[in-house]
Amino acid sequence: MKLKLKNVFLAYFLVSIAGLLYALVQLGQPCDCLPPLRAAAEQLRQKDLRISQLQAELRRPPPAPAQPPEPEALPTIYVVTPTYARLVQKAELVRLSQTLSLVPRLHWLLVEDAEGPTPLVSGLLAASGLLFTHLVVLTPKAQRLREGEPGWVHPRGVEQRNKALDWLRGRGGAVGGEKDPPPPGTQGVVYFADDDNTYSRELFEEMRWTRGVSVWPVGLVGGLRFEGPQVQDGRVVGFHTAWEPSRPFPVDMAGFAVALPLLLDKPNAQFDSTAPRGHLESSLLSHLVDPKDLEPRAANCTRVLVWHTRTEKPKMKQEEQLQRQGRGSDPAIEV
């Protein structure tokens, strides 16, 4: 056993000596190691350069976001709103004015159905912060709705909308606010916004660049979830409506806007108070555009951005009872 261990140890010693001698011999031989070392150094240099570039990009400030056009460069939106005295008038006008205040480059034409300007409307306009023109015209007695009469018997707001068109065409009549009409060449769009509808701010940007007459759907109108144009390949080919679809323009008053230059080029185009039921919008649009040339907006008329809402008429039974007792609400407090 001892002999075997001795032989193993001797063999290990001889192999180690042989390996050492071989290594010593190789140290004296020439070695072509420089090219691989140079390649490795170049790779390290390229990596260092890329790291420096990435660090510089991280330190660089982000690019400024694209800026929207300056307000002065935007076409003006002229919003025409007829209004009349009633208990909810101020509430309606406050809501609408605060929506309009979110829209840049907007001019509000508020037209009262009255003999003269009322303190309520004058004060509201002055406090609104909006660029406005205050107009007044009284609806003729023969065209007024009687108590309890349905709204379709006489279309409301005809005289008031036409009064606003007269002002835009330079025929005067302003009783407050901006009294000078837009100068020739003004780029703008005219929209007829009733005081009781609900409007998305997006709607006004959809209409701003109207070239002729633009259109879109209106929600909660005509006994339907919405009414609006039907669009195919970017063109209006029909209308989704239940009430008399054969009308020349079966659209709601809130569902279109007209380029200001087009209205000024057609000085006789206005609303006809004698138009058949449901044809009031058509009485104006028929003078301005062919249905095939309507400009669909709101994602090809697939989005509803305005709603034909109605505020419930307040019930004043308790107020009337207190008034009979001489204890009615203070009339000096404006509501």
Swiss-Prot record:
N-glycosylated. Changing residue 301 to A: Enzyme inactivation and loss of glycosylation. Mn(2+) binds at residue 196. Changing residue 281 to A: Absence of enzymatic activity in presence of uridine diphosphate-glucuronic acid (UDP-GlcUA). Does not increase PXYLP1-induced 2-phosphoxylose phosphatase activity in presence of uridine diphosphate-glucuronic acid (UDP-GlcUA). Glycans are attached at residue 300. Residues 312-322 have a biased composition (Basic and acidic residues). It is linked to Multiple joint dislocations, short stature, and craniofacial dysmorphism with or without congenital heart defects: An autosomal recessive disease characterized by dysmorphic facies, bilateral dislocations of the elbows, hips, and knees, clubfeet, and short stature, as well as cardiovascular defects. This is Galactosylgalactosylxylosylprotein 3-beta-glucuronosyltransferase 3. GO terms for molecular function: galactosylgalactosylxylosylprotein 3-beta-glucuronosyltransferase activity; glucuronosyltransferase activity; metal ion binding; protein phosphatase activator activity. The keyword Transmembrane applies. It comes from Homo sapiens. Ubiquitous (but weakly expressed in all tissues examined). Belongs to the glycosyltransferase 43 family. GO terms for cellular component: cis-Golgi network; extracellular exosome; Golgi apparatus; Golgi membrane; membrane. UDP-alpha-D-glucuronate binds at residues 82-84, 113, 156, 161, 194-196, 308-310. Homodimer; disulfide-linked. Interacts with PXYLP1; the interaction increases the 2-phosphoxylose phosphatase activity of PXYLP1 during completion of linkage region formation in a B3GAT3-mediated manner. One of its GO terms (biological process) is glycosaminoglycan biosynthetic process.
